[in-house]
Regions:
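Aromatic (Trp/Tyr/Phe) and Gly/Pro-enriched flexible surface segments
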Residues: 21-291
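Bacterial Sec-dependent N-terminal signal peptides
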Residues: 1-25
């Protein structure tokens, strides 16, 4: 065998070992939203109940990305398509989700971005919505968790109507916001998925974080070889944080959708064990089974 071919094979093996490919699962127990929240997402100092998921089952699951370039080792993934499409070893096309094509809060967020970045586009609709939501009680005065946003809309469709969008909507004591909130939380909700230190807050979409704007937070995955994850681009890991009142009940809705059409998927990756409030964890045993 040609020495150059041997060298190339060795080099590719070394790359593969240094950058392990992502693995995805939505089979038991990762097909349970209760398991994903209580056994994957929750960290210290929070208890959770009333867990619900809305969307196609193919749009949510568990990921393991240890030694990949994602920036998060493992956790929950939400997708606007079939999560299997993230696997570089999967050849073909995943199933098309049969999920809701409406979410006023996400549409409002998507269309709040253009004037904030001096762009003229307008998002005409919302498609392939996936949401995880639950009530929680924090054990301190701060809530935080880590996440990454990725999309195959990068970079072709930045600053266009195909502005895929997500939001982390939190409601509860001390919070008054413009977005919807469930019964029992009458003062609306706020979105805590924003570009760090942006004033006014700039929601994270493909048009607000990319190679041209806030580029310090953008990773171009198309130039990566070998790819550890089938995604054109993604953000660096962010920390969502907000002030809360210790011992009070709050509600959070984690939502993701395609903008203007159902083509080209986007994802939100939530780091395992990062949803925390600086205390010892006490998970409720009375969580409703709303899978």
């Amino acid at each position: 065998m040609d020495a150059r071919i041997v060298f190339l094979l060795i080099y590719m093996c070394l790359l593969a070992n240094n950058h392990a490919q992502i693995t995805i699962s939505n089979t038991n127990p990762y097909n349970s939203s209760n398991h994903l929240i209580n056994n994957v997402l929750l960290g210290g100092g929070v208890s959770a109940n009333n867990v619900t998921y809305q969307g196609d089952p193919i749009q949510v699951g568990f990921f393991n990305a240890i030694n990949s370039n994602l920036g998060i080792d493992s956790g929950i993934v939400l997708s606007t398509g079939d999560i299997i499409d993230l696997d570089p070893n999967f050849f073909g096309f995943g199933n098309i989700p049969s999920s809701t094509n409406s979410d006023p809060d996400l549409l409002n967020i998507a269309n709040s971005v253009p004037p904030l970045i001096n762009q003229p586009f307008n998002v005409t609709g919302i498609f392939d919505v996936a949401t995880l939501e639950f009530d929680f009680i924090p054990n301190s005065d701060t809530l935080s968790f880590k996440y990454v946003f990725g999309s195959n809309e990068y970079l072709t469709w930045i600053n266009s109507e195909y502005n895929d969008v997500f939001g982390f909507f939190i409601s509860g004591p001390g919070i008054t916001g413009p977005y919807s909130s469930p019964p029992g939380f009458p003062n609306g909700s706020i979105n805590i998925a924003n570009v760090p230190n942006s004033i006014p807050p700039l929601p994270i979409t493909i048009s607000s974080v990319n190679n041209l704007l806030n580029s310090q937070y953008y990773i171009d995955n198309q130039s990566t070889f070998p790819q550890t994850i089938s995604c054109n681009g993604f953000t660096t890991s962010f920390t969502a944080t907000t002030v809360v009142q210790c011992g009070e009940i709050y509600h959070i809705r984690l939502a993701l959708a395609d903008g203007s059409d159902a083509n080209l998927d986007s994802w939100v990756f939530l780091e395992a064990g990062s949803f925390s409030s600086n205390g010892s964890v006490s998970v409720s045993s009375g969580i409703a089974n709303n899978d």
